[in-house]
Each structure stands twice: as structure tokens, then as C-alpha cells.
Amino acid sequence: MENDAGEFVDLYCPRKCSASNRIIHAKDHASIQLSIAEVVPATGRMTENTKSYALCGAIRRMGESDDCIVRLTKKDGILTKNF
């Protein structure tokens, strides 16, 4: 689709589930997106960096969302490996 300036724009940019790599469609009202902030361990203050995770409704319906969040944050180094 084109806007008034003649540039091509998308109406909807689909997200992908961070755990299952499925595309989250527009009518998936059970899907969530979490943004976890990085914290400086010495001061306990939040930095400018955040990490976003999107989970589809199918993962949440199966009750696997907490396990997926732990697995993804361990992989990214937010949680320690022995958590």
C-alpha cells in the first residue's frame, strides 16, 4: 500500500513467537509481548537496554509460557545458568 507521499508502507507488521517461531496473527488476542530491562548489578538501576519476547497464545494455552521465558532469558544471559 502507498501513502500520500508515494512511499510503500505496511498496514500490519506480524510478530514471531520467540519460543516457537510461529507467526502471531492479528486475531491472536492471547499473545503477549514482554520487555525485560537490563539492570546494573552494583547499583540496581535499569539501563537503556531492554530485551523483548513475544509469546503466542498457543504456548500460553499449553501452560508452557513460564518455561519458555526462563529458557529464553537463560540463553540471552539475563538469568544465570543454574537458576
UniProtKB/Swiss-Prot annotation:
GO terms for cellular component: cytosol; ribonucleoprotein complex; ribosome; rough endoplasmic reticulum. One of its GO terms (molecular function) is structural constituent of ribosome. Keywords: Cytoplasm, Endoplasmic reticulum, Ribonucleoprotein, Ribosomal protein. The keyword Zinc does not apply. The keyword RNA-binding does not apply. It holds the Pfam family Ribosomal_S21e. InterPro entries: Ribosomal_eS21 (IPR001931), Ribosomal_eS21_CS (IPR018279), Ribosomal_eS21_sf (IPR038579). It is found in: Cytoplasm, Cytosol; Cytoplasm; Rough endoplasmic reticulum. One of its GO terms (biological process) is translation. Belongs to the eukaryotic ribosomal protein eS21 family. Component of the 40S small ribosomal subunit. This is Small ribosomal subunit protein eS21. It comes from Agriotes lineatus (Lined click beetle). The gene is RpS21.
